[in-house]
Amino acid sequence: MINPSSMENFNMLYQLSKVEVGQHFYWQIGDFEVHGQVLLVSWFVMTIIISLSIFGTRNLQTIPTGTQNFVEYVLEFIRDLAKTQIGEEDYRSWVPFIGTIFLFIFVSNWSGALVPWKLIEIPNGELAAPTNDINTTAALALLTSISYFYAGFSKKGLRYFKRYISPTPVLLPINLLEDFTKPLSLSFRLFGNILADELVVGVLITLVPLVVPMPLMLLGLFTSAIQALIFATLAAAYIGEAVEDHH
């Protein structure tokens, strides 16, 4: 005779086994395969950001209210962040880049925490935050690396490469290694935190629906915002380091 409690344990383990990592909905584009679910949610995120920008600036007022007030607050926050990390002289041209990085990661992270993507069925895998995919975070990290290389080289020219042998040529291997570790740390930090948060919430919802996961979901929202801030701050700091004049 089968014990009912054993059946309950079996059903619970079966539900947990459905919490999967690495499932992808592939799109075939020529000879390349792309992660379709990442593109779908990325388009959703970009639509939110663009819509907010349009609604916040379509009828500008001297005394901002509503959406315009919110957009101006976000812009001031990003501007202050860039100014602090990059410096008064060079920050203005980098505000759009830092703002785009911050907003994309922030909205992506929150979309994964707030939007019930699991209710939308796709042929394979499941929809989730774009930052839940290592390809997205790696692309953002590489874009940041290219940006600070460009920032330093465009301002200093060939003098930029002097930083690799300063204050002594002995540090050349370490300085070169640092350029490889920066994008790695950026991408894996963001990917690991977002993936872990979604997995923990997914498992707890399976075990104890609604009651226990709610505080963790709220904590996840806070963590998601912090991760966006950390990524944008480090990106701005790397650019500031590249354009800084050493005397």
UniProtKB/Swiss-Prot annotation:
One of its GO terms (cellular component) is plasma membrane. Its main location: plastid. It is a multi-pass membrane protein. InterPro entries: ATP_syn_F0_a_bact/chloroplast, ATP_synth_F0_asu, ATP_synth_F0_asu_AS, F0_ATP_A_sf. SUPFAM superfamilies: F1F0 ATP synthase subunit A (SSF81336). It is found in: Plastid, Chloroplast thylakoid membrane. Keywords: ATP synthesis, CF(0), Chloroplast, Hydrogen ion transport, Ion transport, Membrane, Plastid, Thylakoid, Transmembrane, Transmembrane helix, Transport. GO terms for molecular function: proton-transporting ATP synthase activity, rotational mechanism. It holds the Pfam family ATP-synt_A. The chain crosses the membrane at residues 36-56, 95-115, 134-154, 199-219, 220-240. F-type ATPases have 2 components, CF(1) - the catalytic core - and CF(0) - the membrane proton channel. CF(1) has five subunits: alpha(3), beta(3), gamma(1), delta(1), epsilon(1). CF(0) has four main subunits: a, b, b' and c. Key component of the proton channel; it plays a direct role in the translocation of protons across the membrane. Belongs to the ATPase A chain family. This is ATP synthase subunit a, chloroplastic. The gene is atpI.
